[in-house]
Amino acid sequence: DPRVRKQYIQEQGAPIVIKADGLAAGKGVTVAMTLEEAYKAVDSMLVQGDFGSAGCRVIVEEFLEGEEASFFALVDGENAIPLESAQDHKRVGDGDTGPNTGGMGAYSPAPVLTKELQSIVMDSIIIPTVKGMSAEGSKFVGVLYAGLMIEKKSGMPKLIEYNVRFGDPECQVLMVRLESDLVQVLLAACRGELNGVSLKWSPGSAMVVVMASKGYPGSYQKGTVIENLEEAEAVAPGIKIFHAGTAFDSEGRFIATGGRVLGVTAKGNDLEEACDRAYLAVENVNWPGGFLPSGYWLESSTSETSMLERE
């Protein structure tokens, strides 16, 4: 009942977080800074049905101030091994503003997830979850994705949600850094043989910038032509363009078929170099029907925020 939800929201006050309880392609969360925003989010889910069956139930959560980070582990039912850290940015606008999306960019490693915090996450969140599921007779095998908030007040990680998949676009930056054979590691997970397995990662950093169809995450035009992708990949070392929503038209040209269309990914000796290379590649993609934020937020290890401006 929307009225019950709104009454509870009024009692709790803003800021507050409103979530669709089902799968909503990464767009089912509203961080409402005012009561009006929260009420509007409830109506969009429960009255207007914007998320279909995914929004038939609504979760109201406490607002936590801090930095979000993504933590991934491979699980074989009893054992879990961590992947490298990553951090994505979901808002569509310049300077990490605007509505949430499935993710407009990511980088790895995430400075906010120090080695000490990663150990805490494994010991206090991942391993207890894996052991608990096994004890209940529901062993989990696969990729466990913990959405975390590194709380500003305490500096400690809090679990916001679980997914059982790789993140998009976090997967892109992880895969270009992974030097181990992913197939063999996944097979080891399937066979219950992860105990003692370790992963090898390339040094340095990786960054992905998502190019989306104009209008996303709202309505957008499909079928716009994308050109110069091979040339864009060749402008600097370590660049890989991942396709998410593309197809060939009758003339053999790439066209956009979705909202988030390209993941322009680059490796570098550090985060700044990876960022420079990714944006250099983006500038060489010829796609009038696409867009991306003109600036990208990078969080330092001291949580101070800087912005690399792009023309």
UniProtKB/Swiss-Prot annotation:
GO MF annotations, alphabetized: ATP binding; metal ion binding; phosphoribosylamine-glycine ligase activity
Query: What UniProt keywords apply to this chain's record, in alphabetical order?
Result: ATP-binding, Chloroplast, Ligase, Nucleotide-binding, Plastid, Purine biosynthesis
Presence of the UniProt keyword GTP-binding in the record: no
Q: Which biological processes are named by the entry's GO terms?
A: 'de novo' IMP biosynthetic process; purine nucleobase biosynthetic process
Q: What are the record's GO terms for cellular component?
A: chloroplast
Report the top EC class in one word. Answer: ligase
Statement: the UniProt record of this protein carries the keyword Chloroplast: yes
- Residues covered by the ATP-grasp domain: 1-191
The record's listing under InterPro entries reads: ATP-grasp, ATP_grasp_subdomain_1, PRibGlycinamid_synth_ATP-grasp, PRibGlycinamide_synth, PRibGlycinamide_synth_C-dom, PRibGlycinamide_synth_C_sf, PRibGlycinamide_synth_CS, Rudment_hybrid_motif
Provide the primary localization.
Answer: plastid
Report the EC number(s), separated by commas if there are several: 6.3.4.13
Q: Which reaction does it catalyse?
A: 5-phospho-beta-D-ribosylamine + glycine + ATP = N(1)-(5-phospho-beta-D-ribosyl)glycinamide + ADP + phosphate + H(+)
Instruction: Please give the pathway this protein is involved in.
Output: Purine metabolism; IMP biosynthesis via de novo pathway; N(1)-(5-phospho-D-ribosyl)glycinamide from 5-phospho-alpha-D-ribose 1-diphosphate: step 2/2
Its annotated compartments are: Plastid, Chloroplast
**What's the superkingdom here?**
Eukaryota
For this protein, the record's NCBIfam families field holds: purD
The Swiss-Prot or TrEMBL record describes its family as follows: Belongs to the GARS family.
Spell out the protein name for this chain: Phosphoribosylamine--glycine ligase
